[in-house]
Structure formats: structure tokens, C-alpha cells
Amino acid sequence: MHSSLIKLGFLLLLIQVSLSHAQLSPSFYDKTCPQVFDIATTTIVNALRSDPRIAASILRLHFHDCFVNGCDASILLDNTTSFRTEKDAFGNANSARGFDVIDKMKAAVEKACPKTVSCADLLAIAAQESVVLAGGPSWRVPNGRRDSLRGFMDLANDNLPAPFFTLNQLKDRFKNVGLDRASDLVALSGGHTFGKNQCQFIMDRLYNFSNTGLPDPTLDKSYLSTLRKQCPRNGNQSVLVDFDLRTPTLFDNKYYVNLKENKGLIQSDQELFSSPDASDTLPLVREYADGQGKFFDAFAKAMIRMSSLSPLTGKQGEIRLNCRVVNSKSKIMDVVEDALEFASSM
């Protein structure tokens, strides 16, 4: 009996440790896998040779991951019989991309450091490296996240901002996930300084804004004409349009210059400057438009805040071996099975 009590006490301690939250740290892989950063960079550089927009796509993947149950790589999971993938959510279907690049990155990392780097951390690192490769700021990514054991499609539909959102709707979505500062919203929206968007997401702005039969009145007339040529009323709505008409592949502050000139591509972007409720966001748009350094600093800080949202840490979740599927047996299940075994032996 005494031996059984010792075993039970040890088991309870193990469970307590397993469910505890460890601290995210930029030095998390310094000893266990310092080469992960070089592997991420090399993989993205190779992908950029054939796909100039992949850096923007990877940043978007990380953003959409963090907005759904925290940064847990749930967006990378494929469909299973027990859950629907977040890839099928409205904000991701036929638009989220870059999964194959993350797959290649993960395979290389597993070869160099087996069972060490989580997919959640890898996506956070890849997002940072993507921004740097496009000319943007660098920051030390806090690592130590674990990967989720399932996807959350319904939560993705509830949490991801939409391109037709008003400013107040945007603020609500950001606040709901823990990003309640105006600088979070304005700086992170600056991720639209590179990359592309599909015509389908701006058709109402161009031809029937708020069911008026007219274009969005905040849209610059010359820019409206340019966009209508790229996205004709009865044209292919999958055609891609640059977010930033000035420097479409560079990560810079021209996104904010565009907003000041009423040349934001999607409604939710222009809302930061043109909405009647923009008293706290408009000054930041002007500040970032006038000073790229201020934008870069704010973006780096906001990325660190976003990437630290509700992480799985310690023994929570798992370190997936393949980012598309959960491991055959999770660490948590190991603990549960040990508990049942000890209980049955008492």
C-alpha cells in the first residue's frame, strides 16, 4: 500500500508538471536546435525563387494561426474524422497558402533536430524570417510553444477578421483574442504592405458598396479606375491584386502612405484611416506613414505580443512530427494511461 501511495504521489506531481505553463523564451532552442533559424531562412529563400509572394503568405498563416486558440499550429492540420480543418474556414479556404513550404521546413528540421521543434514555433520563426527577407524588421521570436491536438474550424470562422469589416468589428476581433491596443491593430494590419488579394474580396467596394449600387466613397477615384480594370464586374474573381500598388513585394511603410491617400485595397484596411471611429487609429496611420522606423518598431512589438497569445507550453499538446497530422499517441494520453495503470494496480 505504501508503495502504491508513493506511485500515486509521483503520478500527481507528474500530471501537475505536465499541465503547467512554461515560459516562452527567444533562447529556447539555443542548445537543442540552434540551426532552426538558418533552416527556416534557407527554405524560404528557395521558395521565393519561384513564388515571390510566399513570404507574405507565410506571415498570413502565422497571423491566422494565432487568432484561433492561440499560436498552436492548428491551422496546419488536415481534415480528420474527428474535426474539420481550419483550412476550410471562410478566412482560409482557397486563400491560405504556404503549407508545402512549412512541410519542407519541418522535414529539414526533423532531420537536424528530431522531435525538438514544434510546428507552432516553426511557423512563428518562419513568419519573422519572411518579414526580414522582404526588407522588414527583425525581432527575437519567443519560443517554447507546443502543437495542438486538433483543429478549430468553427472558432476560425468566429475569430478571423474579414476584409469587409468596419473598424469597430476589427477592434472587437482583436480585443477578443487579447490584442486590445490600437497599436496592435494598426501595426499588424501593416502586414498588408506586401502580398496579394483576390478580386472577390473587393468587388462590393468597387461596384456595390453597402448595397448602394455605387463604389466605396472613401476610395480614391484614380485607384478605383485602376482596380476596376483589374477586376471587371463580370470578370474572374480569383484574379490577384497587389495590396500595395507602390512596392508590392517589399515590407515597408508604404501601406500607410496608401491609406492616407485613400488607396487601401480592402475596406478593413481603409477603415483604419477613414472611419468616423478612427480617432485612435488615424494618428498611428499618419505616424507610421511618416516614419518607417516607428512602424517597424511597433510591428515587431505587436508580433511578439500576438505570437505569445495563449500558447500551449510545458507538456501540453505535443511536438508534431508532421505538421499536417497529430502524432499517433500524444504525451497527454501517455500520462492518462499511466494514471489508469497505477490506479488498477492499487
Swiss-Prot record:
Site label Transition state stabilizer, positions: 60
Alphabetized Pfam families for the sequence: peroxidase
Broad class of where this protein is predominantly found: secreted
Catalytic residues (UniProt): 64
Family listed: Belongs to the peroxidase family. Classical plant (class III) peroxidase subfamily.
Lineage: Eukaryota, Viridiplantae, Streptophyta, Embryophyta, Tracheophyta
Record keyword Metal-binding present: yes
Annotated binding of heme b, by residue: 192
Remaining remarks: There are 73 peroxidase genes in A.thaliana.
Residues making up the signal peptide according to the UniProt record: 1-22
Free-text cofactor note: Binds 1 heme b (iron(II)-protoporphyrin IX) group per subunit.
Protein name in UniProt: Peroxidase 37
Binding locations of substrate: 161
GO cellular component, one term: plant-type vacuole
Annotated positions of the Pyrrolidone carboxylic acid modification: 23
Annotated S-S bridges: 33-113, 66-71, 119-323, 199-231
